[in-house]
A protein has these predicted regions:
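Transmembrane helices with small-residue packing motifs
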Residues: 31-36, 71, 110-147, 189-191, ...
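Extracytoplasmic/periplasmic membrane-proximal domains and adjacent transmembrane bundles
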Residues: 268, 275-476, 485-488, 556-558
């Protein structure tokens, strides 16, 4: 017993170092998710170091000061068999450890259960999403009318939408912006909403009741808003998008396809077919593109013959057009001591700055009239024609690309499912003379001689986050393996310690399925945290077995004693973590973390104390 007591600080040190190494992966997440992830391992590592010193220094001192009488009495009998929990454990574990065949059968069943739990991802009973929707207090409705619409048309459309949504009880107020940008946040910065200042562009800011004063989350309200606006009669070609503030890094579009190709015409043709594929998927909504319909422009050309006939100077025509549509400053008001003179300007109202018959009657100075001085109408010396204007040009990292973007709502709300559905629609579509694009998942293409569809948006953030976390997690596991090899002097024993890590998926996937919650980045964080807890539990068992197996006793008795004695502290540790995780179970962002910890701890705690001894029996 004294030898075991002396081993406590050493074992605790191993556990602390293993847990510290397990939390490092989140420090190596690149991209926009990096700043969101990096504080977690830093704070967790500091807390782990602090708790280690408390456990090996402060707790024994407090026991000596406050628990002296209990320590004198002792609980030798309880420690020997683990008490009531230990006896229950022995009753359950004894049949499993009775023979190698039973141990192998148990391990096979556990392995099949782990694979079956991961099968929930394949069957889509558990979906994958980087970050769930948060419960915010405001939403946005972004509206784009056809090019050439006036500010009045835009404002009229916004008011129709407000009237349609006005009876929703969760909405406190609306703020409408026609022809100008609303105050933008981080999401608006990334999506360039601050540049929305054209007459056909509008924005509605929907302010909601506080979270505690309404029964629905903001995401459910957004779905309701989108459904109500579907039946509204809008001008043909109008695009309306319901935008929710993202809980994590904002992107240009949740589902974003970038089309690369040899020339602009090919890119737009391919993008048009891709947009049709987007619209064919029921759960893809708010479909839009970066180029829209080809805009028209009014071209004012000077009639040189009439210019010579009326002896009108070109500069006079240009000055007239500039004054007509840009206004002019005729003087300054020097009130207030002249420190800040106020310009006196003559300019048309914004709504009247159009090229029509009235504008063409504007006088222009002429010298060919009787008496040598006079004026002619602007329409006498210019001709006006409507011509197609150039498409807007979008570039990503300096390379021209057309973009098709959309949101997801309904059966699936993660980009991976929209991507799979669109890829399937693209493969089944009749492309005719339009070249079919090659699908790329990551990285801009090197060869643009043929059309290429690159998936971006939330998928890019998801790919980078899970790739970096997964790779760093593998490195962390390798580091833990090396640490345990150095401690125990064995290459096989660390494999036994690390084997139960996948067992957490049994509880994690079942928990997400029961709560109908997606497997998110916070769920992945929970899995990483659980891996550290599993390693701690495994080291506790293996360390006890190693120091109890050299006394000539049967292996099964040693394994049962190790499980009986260690089961109670392992269970108490799990319960403490589960109580802490239960607090965030209702949080929309960290629900995945809470589910992973709660249900993963249940499955891993109950199975680890059986799997480790079963591996010893199976491989003895």
């Amino acid at each position: 017993m004294q030898q075991r007591i002396e081993r406590i600080p050493v074992a605790d040190g191993e556990l602390a170092v293993a847990s510290l190494g397990d939390g490092r992966p989140m420090l190596f997440v690149s991209g926009m998710m990096g700043p969101y992830m990096s504080p977690i391992p830093a704070n967790a590592s500091a807390a782990m170091l602090f708790s280690f010193f408390v456990a090996v220094i402060l707790t024994p001192w407090l026991m000596m000061k406050l628990g002296r009488k209990e320590a004198v009495r002792g609980h030798a009998h309880a420690a020997a068999d683990g008490g009531r929990l230990g006896r229950i454990y022995a009753m359950v574990a004894r049949p499993v450890l009775r023979s190698r065949a039973r141990a192998w059968a148990f391990l096979l069943v556990v392995g099949m259960a782990t694979i079956a739990s991961l099968g929930l991802l394949y069957t889509k009973h558990v979906t994958v999403k980087l970050l769930p929707f948060d419960n915010k207090t405001n939403l946005q409705v972004i509206v784009d009318l056809p090019k050439g619409s006036s500010v009045e048309d835009t404002d009229r459309t916004l008011q129709q939408m407000v009237e349609r949504l006005g009876d929703m009880p969760e909405i406190v107020s609306f703020q409408t912006y026609a022809g100008t940008a609303s105050p933008f946040d981080f999401n608006g910065l990334v999506r360039h909403y601050y540049l929305r200042a054209e007459p056909q562009q509008g924005d509605i800011v929907v302010n909601l009741l506080p979270k505690g004063s309404r029964g629905r989350a903001s995401h459910a309200i957004a779905l309701d808003i989108r459904k109500r606006l579907e039946g509204l009669a809008l001008p043909q070609g109008t695009v309306a998008k319901v935008v929710e503030p993202p809980p994590g890094p904002p992107v240009l579009g949740t589902l974003l396809a970038e089309i690369y190709g040899p020339d602009a015409e090919t890119r737009r043709a391919v993008a048009g077919k891709v947009r049709e594929a987007f619209k064919s998927v029921p759960f893809i909504v708010d479909v839009d593109d970066s180029y829209h319909n080809q805009p028209q422009r009014m071209r004012v050309a000077i009639d040189q013959d009439n210019l010579d006939y009326y002896r009108v100077e070109q500069s006079d025509v240009y000055d007239t057009l500039r004054y007509l549509y840009g206004g002019t400053t005729v003087g300054y008001s020097h009130r207030g001591g002249g420190r800040q003179p106020i310009p006196i300007r003559i300019a048309l109202p914004k709504g009247e700055k159009v090229i029509d018959e009235r504008a063409l009657t504007t006088p222009v100075p002429a010298n060919a009239l009787p008496a040598g001085l006079g004026v002619v109408e602007l329409g006498d010396v210019v001709s006006v024609s409507e011509q197609p204007a150039s498409y807007p040009v979008f570039r990503h990292n300096g390379r021209a690309a057309e973009m098709v973007m959309a949101e997801l709502a309904g059966a699936y709300e993660a980009p991976i499912y929209g991507m799979l559905a669109v890829n399937d629609a693209i493969s089944k579509a009749d492309w005719g003379n339009v070249p079919k694009p090659v699908i790329a998942l990551h990285g801009q293409p090197d060869d643009e001689t043929r059309p290429i569809l690159l998936w971006d948006g939330e998928w890019e953030v998801t790919w980078v986050t899970f790739r970096d976390m997964g790779a760093a997690f593998m490195v962390a596991i390798l580091g833990i393996y090396i640490l345990v090899v150095a401690q125990f002097g064995s290459f096989k024993l660390p494999l036994v310690i690390l084997t139960p890590i996948p067992l957490t998926f049994i509880g994690i996937m079942l928990g997400h399925w029961l709560f109908a919650a997606p497997f998110t980045a916070t769920s992945m964080i929970g899995f990483i945290a659980l891996a550290g807890i599993i390693v701690r539990n495994s080291i506790l068992l293996v360390d006890f077995i190693r120091h109890s197996g050299g006394q000539g006793r049967p292996m099964v008795d040693v394994l049962l004693e190790a499980g009986s004695v260690r089961f109670k502290p392992i269970l108490l540790t799990a319960l403490a973590a589960m109580i802490g995780a239960g607090v965030i179970l209702t949080d929309p962002i960290f629900q995945g973390l809470a589910i992973a910890l709660l249900f993963g701890l249940v499955s891993s705690t109950l199975l680890t104390v059986l799997v480790i001894p079963a591996i010893y029996v199976a491989l003895k």
